[in-house]
């Protein structure tokens, strides 16, 4: 309600509150020098003197989720090397699930060498950090198990029986794990620690596989690979509240990422050769932004300004600038390749991607796109996890952190 001349006290209070709000909101807006150096750019605004503080008044998040640090940047907690005390002591590693070899290759990112090979269940698809960031879950899809790995020791624990775990996510409040049961055509909400089934949500689309959550955590968008559809799911109610067919014949949507400001969702499509851009709130008709052949994985830079888009069918990575709302660069892998899923190093300087059909892993310089390493691994490497990474908690997949 706007103040009136008769309510000077209210006016004064409102102005003071507004000033405090602006000051708080501004805390998380700038990028650190390390991130700019990692990407070879200069900051558009001076870096803040103090770390971001929660702005509780503006975002009414999913009950129980940690407060949003900056309503203008959902990735505000993911700045270079800002590791949580929970993960700070973990050795830096790259965990590569080899789908056709039933193993996980463990790479030391400093030497680019494989230091361990872990035998897991049948057809491991993704390595997923748990919500509390204490465990890495290997999704053994056809083996119907999840293998826990202790990121502190690198040792695998006893597999947990979970049917059809193609991919795995966690609700922002940490209350549930969400299994993308692709062949079962289900979203299965489970206990995030024991993986006990709590609720099963049948879906009418085919091939649920990737997702991301809204800024407030109250809903998430899911891609259905084999029927070319998208779902909108109410997180708290655990209910599908929207469904649409992508406007492209033969569409095969893959990875999903929300924009830093939470206003748009991007969905990679390997058959449409680009990203669908969607307003998640309205869940209206999306538009297609071409990127390259076989568009697959989407990864955010440590300063939240760019997104790295892997084009598996042509061996390239496109760079999308959120502020300019356009593609600014394209990096081509020397000798080709099949860049698929991966993640960004904790310092933001290296993009790691699996070479799905080449039995290899690529390490790329995020400033120049230069290939730093090409490492032979097992057969069918897929959703590799770079770990640890900055953030307060994990939403799953190969590492979506808030």
Name each region found by the language model.
Residues 27-402:
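Predominantly soluble domains enriched in secretory-pathway, periplasmic, or organellar proteins
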Residues 14-25:
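Bacterial N-terminal signal peptides
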Residues 2-15:
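Bacterial N-terminal signal peptides that target proteins for export
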């Amino acid at each position: 309600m706007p103040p009136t001349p008769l309510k000077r006290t209210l006016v004064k209070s409102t102005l003071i509150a507004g000033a405090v709000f602006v000051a708080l909101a501004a805390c998380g807006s700038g990028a650190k020098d390390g991130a700019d150096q990692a990407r070879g750019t200069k900051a558009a605004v001076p870096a803040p003197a103090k770390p971001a503080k929660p702005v509780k008044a503006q975002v009414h998040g999913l009950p129980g989720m940690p407060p949003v640090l900056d309503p203008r940047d959902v990735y505000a907690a993911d700045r270079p090397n800002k590791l949580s005390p929970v993960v700070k002591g973990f050795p830096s590693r790259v965990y590569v699930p080899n789908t056709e070899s039933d193993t996980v290759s463990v790479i030391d990112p400093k030497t680019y060498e494989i230091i361990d090979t872990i035998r897991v269940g049948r057809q491991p698809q993704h390595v997923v950090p748990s919500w509390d960031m204490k465990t890495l879950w290997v999704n053994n899809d056809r083996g119907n198990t999840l293998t826990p790995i202790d990121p502190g020791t690198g040792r695998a624990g006893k597999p947990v029986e979970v049917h059809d775990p193609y991919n795995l996510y966690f609700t922002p409040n940490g209350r549930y794990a969400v299994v993308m049961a692709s062949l079962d055509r289900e979203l299965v909400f489970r206990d995030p620690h024991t993986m006990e089934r709590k609720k099963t949500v049948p879906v009418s689309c085919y091939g649920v596989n990737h997702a991301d959550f809204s800024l407030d955590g109250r809903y998430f968008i899911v891609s259905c690979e084999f029927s070319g559809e998208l779902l909108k799911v109410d997180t708290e109610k655990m209910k599908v509240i929207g469904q649409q067919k992508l406007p492209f014949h033969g569409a095969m949507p893959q990875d999903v990422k929300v924009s830093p400001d939470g206003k748009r969702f991007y969905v990679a499509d390997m058959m449409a050769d680009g990203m669908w851009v969607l307003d998640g709130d309205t869940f209206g008709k999306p538009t297609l932004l071409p990127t390259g052949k076989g568009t697959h994985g989407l990864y955010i830079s440590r300063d939240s300004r760019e997104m790295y888009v892997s084009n598996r069918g042509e061996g390239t990575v496109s760079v999308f600038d959120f502020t300019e709302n356009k593609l600014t660069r394209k990096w081509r892998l020397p000798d080709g390749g099949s860049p698929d899923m991966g993640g960004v190093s904790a310092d933001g300087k290296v993009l790691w991607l699996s070479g799905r059909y080449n039995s290899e892993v690529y390490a790329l310089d995020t400033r120049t796109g230069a290939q730093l390493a090409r490492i032979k691994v097992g057969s069918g490497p897929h959703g590799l996890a770079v770990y640890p990474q900055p953030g307060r908690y994990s939403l799953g997949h190969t590492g979506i952190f808030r």
